[in-house]
Amino acid sequence: MAQANFGVVGMAVMGKNLALNVESRGYTVAIYNRTTSKTEEVYKEHQDKNLVFTKTLEEFVGSLEKPRRIMLMVQAGAATDATIKSLLPLLDIGDILIDGGNTHFPDTMRRNAELADSGINFIGTGVSGGEKGALLGPSMMPGGQKEAYDLVAPIFEQIAAKAPQDGKPCVAYMGANGAGHYVKMVHNGIEYGDMQLIAESYDLLKRILGLSNAEIQAIFEEWNEGELDSYLIEITKEVLKRKDDEGEGYIVDKILDKAGNKGTGKWTSESALDLGVPLPLITESVFARYISTYKDERVKASKVLSGPALDFSGDKKEVIEKIRKALYFSKIMSYAQGFAQLRKASEEFDWDLPYGTIAQIWRAGCIIRAEFLQNITDAFDKDSELENLLLDDYFVDITKRYQEAVRDVVSLAVQAGTPIPTFTSAISYYDSYRSENLPANLIQAQRDYFGAHTYERTDKAGIFHYDWYTED
């Protein structure tokens, strides 16, 4: 007998917490896990909640009111396909499957098309905020059939994080098929960029200025009170003050400098390459993680490859402020690249992505939540056809005032032999984007020389080829 309003498949921490989040809003939630003992564990732990414990998929599906609203919180990839395959014979036309996993958007597009043939609605939903966000309120990026989203929107709007600025829920319809998971993918790419920029700032403060963890922590705390106010700056200041619970000193100094990844940053860069969109800062942040994993080689190289030694004797306070400005400037470059990629993808896949709304739903609940996202929303509210954020008046003003600081910081780091790939990439992207003329004319001449790839001229229309092998 149907008794549940919503169902969640997958009782790992994200699935469990999302189920509890939905239940806390007054809904009865059916729960299922392939391993029954896991479902039973969650049920017994929360017997005071309106959870329906089910042992089989048949029992799970049968417990749900129609149209059934089922959220899949299982491992992305083959596990998701297997779960859908098992569910499909049990569902009725009009039922709604929601994939809340970290799914690659082409998989979501494929599943949406396949399930549409069976009359089953499919909503690929990017969920950001980690396990805490899942429980208390994540940022959610759903994409799929609009009429299906309308049936789950009341629940999503209740469980999503609420922006502190205006209390609006951090969820909105992104567009058809894979739009939601694409937006989440770019969110993750921007997250890579933000984290690497913060890491480089930390390295500059520590390596060049010789500041202690306590001093750097205080700097990040101050930065978080201004235009850099964000979740990642907030947790950075927390990380820097934590002591090692297994010995002396700070825990950050005991953590091996090898950064892991789950591949979502790579997906963002791969898609940018496929679309022909310049995404240098985010891509450099992916490569920075990769080179960090070459620890043994880096140790060997450090003993044989020479570099400059800089004994800094300047005004530390002045440099700290320049690093702050460089960080904000570079953050803007990262978001400008990310939103330019969203625009290109929206055109390519016919999604009509709501750019200003995307920035709005990232204001709370998600990893990249930041105060300056409102400036992005304002920019698209003023001009929905804005080609690049750098052309908006607010960002024009910031880049005009802060670019000198970035150039100084990059110069200082190069002189000190301190790697700052994303800071360097930021100013290079800015200079490339603002250049009326680039040396690509020479590249096109070379291509025409060795491969007869032709070229266009600046003085007249048409496609041309030069006879390079004829002597002057």
Swiss-Prot record:
Q: Per its UniProt record, what InterPro entries does this chain match? A: 6-PGluconate_DH-like_C_sf, 6PGD_dom2, 6PGDH_C, 6PGDH_Gnd/GntZ, 6PGDH_NADP-bd, 6PGdom_BS, NAD(P)-bd_dom_sf, Pgluconate_DH
Active site residues of this protein:
184, 191
Question: Which positions does UniProt annotate for NADP(+) binding?
Answer: 10-15, 33-35, 74-76, 102
Q: Where does substrate bind?
A: 102, 128-130, 187-188, 192, 262, 289, 447, 453
Subunit structure, interactors included: Homodimer.
Say what the protein does.
Catalyzes the oxidative decarboxylation of 6-phosphogluconate to ribulose 5-phosphate and CO(2), with concomitant reduction of NADP to NADPH.
Family, as annotated: Belongs to the 6-phosphogluconate dehydrogenase family.
* Listed name of the protein: 6-phosphogluconate dehydrogenase, decarboxylating
What is the organism field in this record?
Lactococcus lactis subsp. cremoris (strain MG1363)
